[in-house]
Amino acid sequence: MAKEDVIEVEGTVTEALPNTQFRVELDNGHNVLAHISGKMRMNYIRILPGDRVKVELSPYDLSRGRITYRYRS
């Protein structure tokens, strides 16, 4: 999947799930299942419920995504 194909949206983490996966409610009201990107994992960036995050969605499966950025609160 090329970088140009992703859809970037913002949302709020509502639930932390096992295996570094999170339930994220997007600004448009949809809920997606998202995992942490590799660079966030390498730099030990912690994500908690209530955090604002940027999520990349694939155009092929809009119910799953990758968390690429956690906004400062």
From Swiss-Prot:
Domain of life: Bacteria
SUPFAM superfamilies named among the record's database cross-references: Nucleic acid-binding proteins (SSF50249)
Annotated Pfam families: eIF-1a
Cellular component, GO, one term: cytosol
Disulfide bridges in this chain: none
Keywords: Cytoplasm, Initiation factor, Protein biosynthesis, RNA-binding, rRNA-binding
An MF annotation (GO) of this entry: translation initiation factor activity
InterPro entries tied to this protein: NA-bd_OB-fold, RNA-binding_domain_S1_IF1, S1_domain, TIF_IF1
Subcellular location: Cytoplasm
Domain annotation S1-like: ranges: 1-72
Keyword rRNA-binding assigned: yes
Main location: cytoplasm
Keyword rRNA-binding carried by entry: yes
Similarity annotation: Belongs to the IF-1 family.
Task of the protein: One of the essential components for the initiation of protein synthesis. Stabilizes the binding of IF-2 and IF-3 on the 30S subunit to which N-formylmethionyl-tRNA(fMet) subsequently binds. Helps modulate mRNA selection, yielding the 30S pre-initiation complex (PIC). Upon addition of the 50S ribosomal subunit IF-1, IF-2 and IF-3 are released leaving the mature 70S translation initiation complex.
NCBIfam families documented for this protein: infA
Description of how the protein assembles with itself and partners: Component of the 30S ribosomal translation pre-initiation complex which assembles on the 30S ribosome in the order IF-2 and IF-3, IF-1 and N-formylmethionyl-tRNA(fMet); mRNA recruitment can occur at any time during PIC assembly.
Protein name (Swiss-Prot/TrEMBL): Translation initiation factor IF-1
